[in-house]
Structures are given as C-alpha cells and as structure tokens.
A protein has these predicted regions:
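N-terminal alpha-helical "arm" segments
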Residues: 1-29
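Sequence/fold signature of self-assembling virion shell proteins
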Residues: 2-6, 143-186, 195, 200, ...
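Assembly/oligomerization interface modules of large self-assembling protein complexes
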Residues: 22-84
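Intrinsically disordered or highly flexible coil/loop and linker segments, enriched in small
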Residues: 26, 30, 37, 41, ...
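Short active-site-adjacent helix-start/loop capping segments
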Residues: 53-55, 96-98, 307
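Catalytic micro-motifs at enzyme active sites that drive phosphoryl/nucleotidyl and oxygen chemistry
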Residues: 72-78, 122, 187-189
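Long, contiguous amphipathic alpha-helices that act as assembly "spine/axial" helices in icosahedral shell
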Residues: 77-134, 201, 302-304
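Internal, conserved structured core segments that host functional sites
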Residues: 125, 129-148, 169
Length: 330
C-alpha cells in the first residue's frame, strides 16, 4: 500500500516534492527544439515521408488545361511512442535527519535528468549519423554518399563529394555548404535548401573554438589581408551541442571506440527550415513527476515518466563530416 508522504518538514510531502521537481524542469532549456519540430500527438504509431516536391509551373496556352503534378510519396519513417522512466528512493531515517537537503537535491536532479533525457534521445540520430544503425527510410545512414531517389534518378550525397571527411575549417565548410545546396527532391526537382534561411553549424564542444572563429571573425581566419569573412556575412548560427559528443555516445552504448578526440571532430551544417521538416519529436504530453511513500517500508519514492517518439523522414537540409580525414563510403 502506498500513501502520500508525511513529514515534519511541510514541503517534504508528495505535493511539495513534485513542486520542486516541476520548478527544476522549468529551469532547463532543451536544445532539441532548435533542430527538431516538437509536436503533440495521441497516436501510438505515426508515419511520415520525405520530400517529393511539387514541380514548377509550365507555360501553357490561354485555354489549355493545367498540367497535373505527379503524386509521389517519399521514403517513409514510422514514429513509435516509447516509454522512459526513472525513480529514486530515500529511507525515512534519512528524511528525518540532517540529510533532508539531499532529498531535495536528488529530487530536483531526477527532474533535470528527465528534461535532459529528451536531448539525449533526440540527438542519438546525429550521434549515429555515420553508423550502421539506424538507417532512415531509404536504407542509408543519415549521412551518406549514396542516398537513392524515389523516382530512380541519380543518387545524392550529404557529405563531401569524394567522401573524404575533412576537418572543420573555413574552406571545408564552404565545400560542405555546396553539398548542402546542390540537392534535388525525390522527383528530381531542385530544392532551395540553404538559400533562403539562416544556416546552423552544429559542433561538439571539441570544435567550439574553431566554429566560433569561423562564424564570427570580422576577417577571413588565417589571412593577412583581412578579407571579408563570408561566414559572418552569411549569418551562421553556431550550436555547441554536448549531446552529439563521444561521452554521450559511449554512455548510450552507441560506440565502443575509446578515441574520444577522433569522434568529437564531427560536425554538421544544417538548414533548420528544411531540417525541421524531416526531424520530428512527437510527445504524448510533458513528462510526469510523482512522489509517494510506502507506509509499510517507510521508503519514499520519486518518479519521472515520459513518452515520446523521435525520428527522421529525410536528410534534406542536413550535411555532415566525421572531420577525421578518413574516406567515408556508406
């Protein structure tokens, strides 16, 4: 049997602890909404497709019929809701003694971890962008040299043309921007990726200095004549994202490599307008917090529960490099 907590401390009750946890969650600013579209849903399963596109208008005679666009569904991704939980327990003796403040700290930390877990789970897509799994609907990694087109047209890529994974630099980023821009829809229609919106350079903390120097220096880095910095004029938003780094990949079992430096050289160039069309975070609701006491064991529990689905229905608006100088062929 479980009942609400009682305590000599008025705030150390189920409602009081839940209030602590809710307040702590509000203090955390998640990163994933900068890259993903956050949607609410009531569906257990939900399918989404990649961009097929509508063709441009054709010139016709004044009384001619309108050319009808061919309907084509792109590659599919199924969003399946998953449940995430964590709880902590504290004995009554600890609550009655001078460890009261630890109860408060731990309950707040649990709530913060719930908020952070959304970032951890969402950015697994980027941590595994070059790996064998998961593959997006076309059967390829998120970053690939051979994304097939649904209409059977020539395969496309969203990394360097020769597959060499160049390190982050002023010139290499321009080459990657060329790759980002030169894309066609699944019907072979040119898409205006990277042309009409602000770009985002997403890096691990390892690359933070190089990224900020590239994006914000007045002159071109490394030049003596202080020529105008293209990237500052381009107005690139730098996102230093710890959740795409080695330590999170290793913690989540996504890599067995112990070469942290090599892993953290990776970086991504995004057009958020298009990236948010294919990157979705679908939640049933905001995560729940609960606190209670078992009146038999006198053990106090606090629990968080979250239900959401993360996925990607396409790769348009996303380009990337491992940055380690290897040749990538996937």
């Amino acid at each position: 049997m479980a009942t609400h907590l009682t305590s000599t401390h008025p705030e150390l009750t189920a409602p009081g602890i839940e209030m602590w946890m809710e307040e702590e969650a509000k203090l955390y600013s998640p990163i994933f909404p900068k890259v993903f579209t956050l949607e609410s849903t009531s569906r257990l399963y939900e399918d989404d497709s990649s961009i097929a596109g509508i063709d441009f208008l054709e010139e016709v005679g004044e009384a001619a019929a309108s050319p009808e666009d061919e309907f084509l569904i792109g590659y599919m991704w199924r969003y399946q809701q998953k449940v995430f939980k964590r709880k902590i327990s504290v004995s009554k003796l600890l609550r009655q003694t001078d460890l009261y403040n630890k109860v408060q700290e731990n309950s707040k930390e649990l709530s913060k971890k719930a908020a952070q877990s959304r970032d951890v789970q969402a950015f697994s897509i980027f941590r595994q962008a070059f790996g064998a799994t998961p593959v997006y609907g076309d059967g390829k990694n998120l970053i690939s040299v051979a994304h097939p087109r649904k209409d059977g047209g020539a395969a496309q890529r969203n990394t360097f043309i020769d597959g060499v994974q160049r390190a982050l630099s002023y010139d290499n980023l321009k080459l990657l921007e060329d790759v980002l821009i030169e894309v066609y829809s699944n019907k072979g229609i040119p898409i205006d990726v990277g042309l009409n919106s602000q770009l985002m350079l997403m890096v691990t903390p390892y690359n933070r200095e190089a990224a900020l120097q590239i994006a914000e220096a007045d002159g071109t880095p490394g030049t003596a004549d202080n020529s105008v910095n293209y990237w500052k004029g381009r107005n690139v938003d730098v996102l230093v994202n710890p959740y795409i780094s080695w330590r999170f990949a290793y913690k989540m079992g996504e890599t067995t490599s112990t070469d942290r430096e090599a892993w953290d050289k990776r970086y991504f160039l995004l057009d958020p307008y298009y990236a948010k069309k294919v990157l979705k975070f679908k939640q049933l609701q905001d995560f729940e917090v609960n606190a209670w006491e078992d009146d038999d064991t006198d053990v106090w529990f606090a629990k968080v529960r979250d239900v959401f689905a993360v996925g990607i229905s396409g790769w348009y608006g996303i380009a990337g490099s491992l940055g380690d100088g290897t040749t990538y062929t996937a």
